[in-house]
Amino acid sequence: MNFDAAGSRDVRYNCLTVFGFNSRRRNRLRSQPFPASWLPILIRNVSYYERLSPADKQELRQTIEVFVAEKNFEGCGGLEMTDEIKVTIAAFACILLLHIENHDYYPRLRSILVYPHAYVVPEARRAVGNFIVESDEARAGESWGNGVVVMSWDHVLHRPTDPGGSGNVVLHEFAHQLDQEKGVATGAPLLPKTSMYHMWARILGREYKALSEAAAANRPTLLDKYGATNPAEFFAVATECFFGQAGQLKERHPELYEELKLYYGQDPARTGSTT
């Protein structure tokens, strides 16, 4: 449980022809006018957008256009896919990318599956005596290493803001996607500089240990206790808190806030939180 960075520098994109084609196509997408019908969706569902500088607003809009064009959105459980669903999810996903240099628009991600409400997964198992008991588990979202993100539209729209709440499911699952870019989620995404991994492991490892101890003792915490599950979940939960409760995180966990600020290149305690 040490936020291992092993494999983080093994990610390579060496097909130059495909890379050149993608770059040209993305540049064309970014140069297109942002659809007029999408802007009210941003303003209505993504309050963080209004707090951004004009340059960051433009960058976010351009990134959203590429994201929506490249990723496959599928409605599940009877949900009809709409621009509102696509743009809202894309906006929160692209907020994470806003100042990450040389990002590749979540290169492993192919599809986003969206259910109308929490969806049931019949995979939870637990041992009871000599028996294995299977039970259904309701989920709001999950990120798979094979290029799929699943989430509940109801949870995307209705984001609890209290410290004990589940936060922002899009930020959470796409933090996992960033963590999974190197192939396995360890709680250490691809950081801008190799020299950053030592401090990242030290600070996030210490904060993860503190959250685990607080969760075991049932003490109140700012960070969602689900982050005590493992380092990968801690990074996702910390990301939610960084963007959603930035001022409180900076005040109560200043070193953790600083590490996330360095990674994301954003200062939401100054800009304003996403919620």
Regions found by a protein language model. Give the residues of each.
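Metalloprotease/metallohydrolase-associated module, dominated by Zn2+-dependent proteases
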Residues: L29, S37, S47-Y49, A55, ...
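Short, charged early-sequence alpha-helical segments and their helix-coil boundaries
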Residues: E74-K86
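N-terminal alpha-helical targeting/anchoring segments
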Residues: T17-L39, E50
